[in-house]
Amino acid sequence: MKGVITMTNIEKFVDMVKNSDNIVFFGGAGVSTESGIPDFRSTDGLYNQHYKYPPETILSHSFFMDNTEEFYRFYRDKMLALDAQPNMAHIKLAELEKAGKLKAIVTQNIDGLHQKAGSKNVLE
């Protein structure tokens, strides 16, 4: 069946990682949601919740300039997760980097969890 993850597929993936020394990881919000960081576009994401203004408006430069207090209120309440800790994905990626297999992490995340897990070459 197409798209089904089987042990054979997982074993192939593990084998690819074991035999690779030039891995670049591309990631986004899904990596940090397990750590309690909200995403934007899922059913429960910030873009699907109801606010006085749409989140994409609140997070714009012009909104920040015109409504600084409202911007910071949204940012503090919805985007800061000061207690968030790296999850297994962050930790394993850091381990791959330390082992010399992972060369870089390219991410849209700005939560610092990759760095907190020990990754050094993170491009946000």
Q: What is each stretch, according to the model?
A:
Residues M1-E124:
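Conserved catalytic core of sirtuin-type NAD+-dependent deacylases
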